[in-house]
Amino acid sequence: MDKQLPAIYNDPYISEYFKILYKEHKENKINETKELLDYISNMEKKIDYMTSEVLELKNTIEQLQNPTIRETMKSITEDIKKTVDNGKKQLSDIKSNILSSVKEYVNQFKQHGKQAVIKTIEISHFKVALRKFHRSLFKCVNKTHLLINKCDAV
């Protein structure tokens, strides 16, 4: 769970995709794509935050004296960890799909040259997937905060 997702802006195909869009005067697609990539970067930061919160929570739970409470909290924490891991996988899949689409379009443009009509990635289906992911992550954050508050109260 501590493996960080690679930054999507660092991918060479993303840079090349932006260059092609810029050369073709597709400013609106540049803005949409940047917005999408910024959103993904923000979600990565939230995943990293959640990962550290779960680790902190596990450490706090280990210090609890009451074995019944400790085991209950461990169980809840494991559920939260699974949710965070699932969110991380979902985000990774979305990034892979975006990068695959970008790579395909860059390669098509290279192959067909300037005569080719520049295709752009379809942003809308990625946005829908990210909204669902965001709702799931938000619920996970709330669960984690509630559990941390319970641990602090004990």
Question: Which residues does each PLM region occupy?
Answer:
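Extended, low-complexity amphipathic alpha-helical repeat segments
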Residues: K95-V154
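Leu/Val/Ala/Ile-rich N-terminal alpha-helices, chiefly Sec-type signal peptides and the beginnings
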Residues: M1-D85, K89
